[in-house]
Every structure is written in C-alpha cells, then in structure tokens.
Amino acid sequence: MHTNSPLRADNQDLETQPLLRPNTEESQLLNDEVRINVANETLIKSRWRSIKCLIIYLLGIVLLSFFGVSIVQYIRGHVPPTDVIEKNLVQVTNFKLVEFQLDGWKDNMGSDLNNDTGKYLQVSIHSQIWFDYDKWPGTENDSDARSQRDWIRYINEKVLKTICIDLNNVTTFDGDLVFKNKLGDVVGMEPICFNLAHRQINNLQFKILVKPSIWKIVKVLKKFWNRDFESLNIKSNLDMTIFKRKFGTRFNLLKLNDEILDWKDIIDWEKISATPLRMIQNMIDGISLQGFTLRDSSSDGFHADMRLNPITILGGVDWLHLPPGTSIPFINWEIKLPDCNGEPAIAIPTLSCFNEPINLHHDKDNIVVCLQNEIEGPLPDELLYQECPQNSLTPMSQIVNAVLNQNETVTFAARGHVLEDGIDNNSLIPADMLEDIFQEASFIPITTNATFNSSELIQEFQINDLQLRWAARKKLSLVGTFLGFFDLSFYETHQQDRVRIDTIRGQIDLYHNDINFLNLPMKQWINSSSHILHDEDTGNTQMKLQFDLENDDMEVVNSLELTRTLNEILFQGFTVIHFNATIDASLTTALGPWVLTGLAGEGDTLVT
C-alpha cells in the first residue's frame, strides 16, 4: 500500500485536527480581550470627558453667578433708582419751542378741519430737544453721581442711540383723577423720534390733537389769573409706548399705561406763568380810546361807537401762530358797573354792548377792536341815587369822574355771549365752545384807565361884567356872569334836552399881580342854565354854561393886595385879575342825573 494514498491523507487530517482547534480558540479569546480593553478605555475616556464637562459646567455656573453678582453690585453702585433717573433726566433734557401753530378744529382724527363745530384742536409743533449729560446733578464732587451719569449716558448713546415715542393718549386733571376734574386729552398723530447722543439737537415736527374740557380749563385759568398757584394740582395720566426701530422692525422697549405725572415736580407754575400773565396784563393796561362818538338814539337814549387803539395780542410770543384769516365773532357783552366801594356789582339791563368781528392778523399786531353800545334810560336807582358815604356822590358820579380823571382807574365786569350771524367768520374757537367759555368764566373784572381827560373837555371859562365893591355893613360884594364852554365834539346831537347842567357849586380864586387876594366860595348849589351850540366853522357840538355870580360871603386872603386892587379900580376905573375856577356840575341826562366834580379852568378878566 502506498503511503500517499487518499485514505492515508484523510487519516492524517483527522489526526492533526484536534491539534489545530485549540490555537483558534486562543486567538478568539485574545481578540475579545482586546475589544474589552478598548471598550474599557473608551468608557474611561467618556467618563473623564463627562466629569470634565460637569466640572466646567459647575465652574461656569460659579463664574456666572459671581459675574452676575458682580453685575448686580455694579448696577447697584452705578445705576440710580428710578425716581432719581426721572428727576435727573429732567435736568439734562433741554427743550426749545420753535413754533406752535394752531391749525384749526376737527371732528375726529380722520376728518378735515371744521372750525364751526369741531371738538379737537389740531396743533402743529416744531420744537428742539437735546440732552446735555454734563448737567447731571452732583457730578462736580460726587463720584457716585458721575458713575450714574456715565452709566445712563453709555446706555443712551451706545445701546439705545435713538428711541421713538407713540403718544397714545395723555389725560390731564386738576385734582383727583376723576372725570369732574378732567382738563382734556392729548393724542399724538404720529410717532416722535429723537437721538439720545450728548448735545445732539433734534428738530422735531409733529402734530397732536387736543380735546379740551372747556369748563374745567376756565377754572384753572382763573387760578392762574388770580395767582392762586397753591391750589393747582395738575396731573397727567400717561398712555404711551417707547420703542426702537431696528432692521425695519419695531421693538417696544417700554409701555407706560396709567403712569401718573405730577407736573409740579417738574414745573414751577408761578415762574412759567409770570411772562404770559404780564403780557396779558400789559395788553389790558394798554387799552385806550382812539375814537369815541356819542349820538342820540331813537329810543330816547344814546348810541356810542368806541374804537380802541390798535392792540397787540401776546406781543413777543413769536412761536405762536394762528390760522390765516382767523377772527373773533360778534360778542354781546353783559356789563356790571362799580358800586360805592368800586366793586363791579351793578347790572345795567338797558345797556347793549357788542364788538364787531375782530380779524386776528398772523403777526398779532395792530388788532383793531370796535365796540357798539346802545343804552336807554333810566339807569338803575342804585347807580343814580345811592349816596356813597365817603364823598356823598352816587356810584354813577364816581364812575363819570374817574373816567374824566386820567390818574384814576375804573373796574367793571363783563360777560360775553356769542352772537350767531350766520356768516362763516373762521372763528378761532367754535361758537358753541366759546359760549361755554363765557358762561363758565362768568363776569370777568377788568380794571382800566380811560384816557378821557376833563381838561380836554373844558374849552374856556370866562367871567363877564365882574364888579367888586363894598356893600352894606362894610361887606365886600362881587357880582358878574360866569360863562363856561365845553367841547362836546364827540357828541352828535340836535336836541337841547338830552344833556343839560342845572346847578353848580365850587370855588373861584382871584389873583392880582400873581397874588391870591380873594376867594369866592359857592358851597350851596346855584341854579345855572346850559345850551347846546354848534361851532360855525367845524360844526362840532359845544355846551355853554352860564350862572350869575352874586355873593357877599367873600374870603379875604390878602388884605394888602385887596387894597391895591380896589385902589386901581378907584383911580383907573378897572383892573385886570386872574381867576382859577373849580366847579361841580349837576347834570340831567336822558339816562338820569349825575354830578361832575372838579371841573377846573382859568382865565383873565376885567374888574370894575
């Protein structure tokens, strides 16, 4: 048998097979061990990574906490409280009003202008605003204040840079925030945006709508006029949104709703109102008559046309602009005249006083006011016949004499009523609203100085046929005729009985060689006569007054000069003397009686 037969080969394989199997298992075990070791190493590395991440995370939390605490401490040390921020921002904010244009009245935000019945006043405002952070209070010697300022400036200039404000609504009250104290609402028609950089001037032009509560505003204006600043308690309820535009997107930063602003915290009412009140007072004080015409009326009274000197409305307020063609409509003025104490308490129901429409120029200068007056008699008894204890005159006599004395003032009260004439006068204030103003304001006292000087009223005094002689019982007697001529060129009349002088009293002082030697007292009322004349050259009205001098109760002031005067009369037949006359005249008019006092005049005359 051959040794290399197939059978032998198979036997050899079978013999060798057990010997080969243990080597394969050992290799497999080695591979498994390697894999286990690799897995363990990977697990260990993963665990170390997790531990490292955990440590880093915990360390990050600690660092962030420390950093957060540091930031909080920094903010606490550098960022002032909210109330300090608000107060100090007012100090660094600068505002200048360039133009305040009253556009007119509207029914609502979307409507056109309607000056007849509009409820909202549209106002166009041009103003400038800028921030001067150097004005932050206390930075000169307080490091905390400087840190606070630097923080606010950094946030404003580097972070915010610009902001915008939507003025949704601002409701203002005087007193508690209830309806009865409401002054009005202000609504913004467009956002207002400005730059927060240091001393960067922002030119702002925007429109607002104002819906006033007239009756309450008038009450507040009265407080200003009466300088009653202590009772002012003006607050505003703010509804506004502060936002920023970035990348074409709007980001709301702060929404203020029901935020209360107390205006006395930022405004000194007495200081800010001083200039406007002074301007208004100067305007009233400057009112004077430019022309005055009096004529008889068909109702047995008088009609008076009064033209005031052109006045300036709020002169010097260059920033205020009125709508072109604006006017004040026909207004009927209800008048009360002063009583004995000078208080305007006597109503005059028979007086009708109204102004013609007043055109308000754009420059507010040279505004012409014309008043038409219709008055019938008789006037109230308390005006004509009540005797005032301080001077035994009636209130009417006191008024007339004050008018004729350029050094005296007269206080009267007036309340207006709008007269609807059916013509579109483009009124500055809608008629119904203006009527509400007048009714709420009621009677407004006005003190004025009427520039109607009595010296201009007296044209000439004369004494004719004056004789000086010794009478019975060695009493000095003076007789003659006194004539007075009064300039009534303002009075258009052809009647003789509408105005007349019935009696006079007073005193005449006589001078010789500039020495007062004799006085003629007329303590009792003396009958007189008067006549209406018309100047032949001008046609102007005059009044001639005449009364007889016949008095034995002379007062000798200088006996020596009296002797010289009588000697001249004795040897020359006459002498020239100078006289000063001061008389009171009792008038009877279609309106009732009154007394003119202190009518003074002088002249020269011959004495025989």
UniProtKB/Swiss-Prot annotation:
InterPro entries: Tag1 (IPR046368), Tag1_C (IPR055011), Tag1_M (IPR055010), Tag1_N (IPR055012)
One of the protein's GO biological processes: cellular response to nitrogen starvation
Annotated Pfam families: Tag1_C (PF22786), Tag1_M (PF22787), Tag1_N (PF20775)
Subcellular location: Membrane
Keyword terms of this UniProt record: Glycoprotein, Membrane, Phosphoprotein, Transmembrane, Transmembrane helix
Keyword Transmembrane: yes
Presence of the UniProt keyword Transport in the record: no
Glycosylated position list: N115, N141, N169, N407, N425, N449, N453, N527, N580
Residues recorded with modification Phosphoserine: S27
GO cellular component term, pick one: membrane
Transmembrane segments annotated in the record for this chain: 55-75
Region spans: Disordered: 1-21
Topology versus the membrane: Single-pass membrane protein
Domain of life: Eukaryota
Residues modified as Phosphothreonine: T24
Lineage, broadest ranks: Eukaryota, Fungi, Dikarya, Ascomycota, Saccharomycotina
Name listed for the protein in its UniProt record: Putative uncharacterized protein YLR173W
PANTHER family: CHROMOSOME 16, WHOLE GENOME SHOTGUN SEQUENCE (PTHR35895), PRE-RRNA PROCESSING PROTEIN (PTHR35895:SF3)
